[in-house]
């Protein structure tokens, strides 16, 4: 058992002190953080999923510039590469950012605006190159928001309620995903309006979040320890490059969590990311029936996700257990994902939404807290 794994046993006492302030959070601060995490995940996921799961796939079909499945796969594949590097880069840059607004806030706000710009480009382009370029900008902007926002969990949230706030973040993310597919299905025949709503939601995500959260402390004072702007630049490059070096000490649980999340998200998105095409080409539904089925699936998954995520997060804090809850959620997801293989119809997809959604709510509500707990270095 590694040192970072020692956080999980029931004998451990999780701290109730906020790392950034060295004191307990007030009730008002807890509510502000909770609402901020919920709205952050909810808003950007509604915008992103309405486009990526419904509107863009349908637009690819109507553009008639190639096989829509190939276009969607190309967009997602290239976008994943940009997302991976952007998350690491902007996470590292936010760690060393010095401003009177703090080190996370500027990136969260700027990320939302950049995401909106990329979303407009992806929708307005009628060629594959423009679509992919726009989506890559979306991934850069989204991760410019996500990396610093998730870091707030370890920066400012006490250990003893981290599972609860992870539930706020994760639960709202999945509810936002369901709400996004529902929204997209309602604009499948009026895509211009749907994309305009999505772009507006992206633009306000970061602004709304930082206005609701308790104001981040200024990080500008740290500049005094740096002798010159040249030294600052060298420090930035050195720390940025160090961010790409995989950890080698006290990292067993970190890599287990990383691989587990990678495999689970891969399996989940093989269904949820292509659900419009699955309904149309695997289940044989029309565009209208596919939209109606997606709406129903969204409502089903939204209900079960709210219930399971809001229960599993606080439960993990009370039990001081993360791994067992994540494992249970993963098994339930696997059962849900398997159903459409044996029931290639609308009912099978609805059962996937209900059973798989319940498991995903359990998993995602606790997974982020687990990832923070098993970091080899809590300061990075």
Language-model features and meaning:
Residues 56, 144-157, 362-377:
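Intracellular juxtamembrane helix-capping segments at the cytosolic ends
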Residues 110, 193-211:
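Symmetry-related core transmembrane helices of the 12-TM Major Facilitator Superfamily/SLC fold
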Residues 104-120, 324-339:
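Structural signature of the two symmetry-related core transmembrane helices
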Residues 8-31, 216-259:
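Juxtamembrane intracellular "pre-TM" segments in multi-pass secondary transporters
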Residues 85-101, 308-321:
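Helix-to-loop junctions at the C-terminal end of transmembrane segments
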Residues 121-134, 341-352:
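Helix-loop junctions at membrane interfaces in 12-TM secondary transporters
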Residues 18-80, 253-285, 297:
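Helix-loop boundary and gating motifs at the non-cytosolic
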């Amino acid at each position: 058992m590694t040192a970072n794994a020692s956080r999980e046993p029931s004998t451990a006492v999780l701290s109730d002190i906020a790392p950034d302030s060295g004191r307990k959070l007030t009730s008002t601060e807890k509510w502000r953080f909770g609402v901020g995490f919920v709205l952050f995940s909810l808003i950007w996921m509604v915008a992103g999923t309405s486009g990526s799961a419904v509107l863009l796939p349908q637009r690819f079909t109507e553009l008639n510039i190639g096989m829509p499945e190939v276009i969607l796969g190309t967009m997602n594949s290239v976008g994943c590469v940009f997302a991976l590097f952007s998350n690491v880069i902007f996470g590292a840059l936010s760690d060393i950012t010095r401003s009177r607004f703090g080190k996370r806030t500027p990136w969260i706000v700027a990320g939302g605006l950049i995401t909106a710009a990329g979303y407009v480009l992806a929708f307005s382009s009628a060629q594959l190159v423009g679509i992919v370029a726009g989506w890559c900008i979306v991934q850069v902007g989204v991760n410019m928001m996500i990396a610093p926002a998730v870091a707030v969990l370890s920066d400012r949230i006490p250990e003893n309620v981290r599972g609860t706030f992870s539930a706020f973040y994760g639960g709202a993310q999945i509810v936002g995903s369901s709400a996004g597919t529902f929204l997209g299905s309602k604009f499948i025949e009026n895509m211009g309006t749907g994309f305009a709503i999505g772009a507006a939601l992206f633009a306000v995500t970061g602004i709304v979040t930082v206005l609701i959260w308790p104001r981040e402390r200024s990080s500008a004072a740290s500049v005094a320890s740096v002798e010159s702007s040249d030294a600052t630049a060298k420090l930035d490059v050195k720390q940025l490059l160090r961010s790409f070096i995989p950890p080698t000490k006290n990292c067993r649980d970190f890599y287990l969590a990383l691989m587990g999340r990678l495999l689970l998200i891969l399996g989940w998105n093989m269904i949820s990311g292509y659900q419009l095409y699955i309904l149309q080409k695997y289940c044989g539904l029309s565009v209208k029936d596919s939209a109606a089925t997606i709406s129903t699936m969204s409502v089903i998954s939204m209900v079960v996700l709210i219930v399971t995520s809001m229960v599993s997060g606080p439960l993990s804090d009370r039990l001081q257990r993360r791994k067992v809850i994540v494992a249970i959620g993963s098994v339930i997801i696997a059962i849900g994902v398997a159903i459409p293989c044996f029931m290639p119809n609308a009912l099978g997809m609805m059962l996937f939404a209900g059973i798989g959604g319940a498991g995903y709510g359990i998993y995602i509500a606790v997974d982020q807290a687990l990832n923070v707990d098993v970091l080899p270095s809590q300061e990075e």
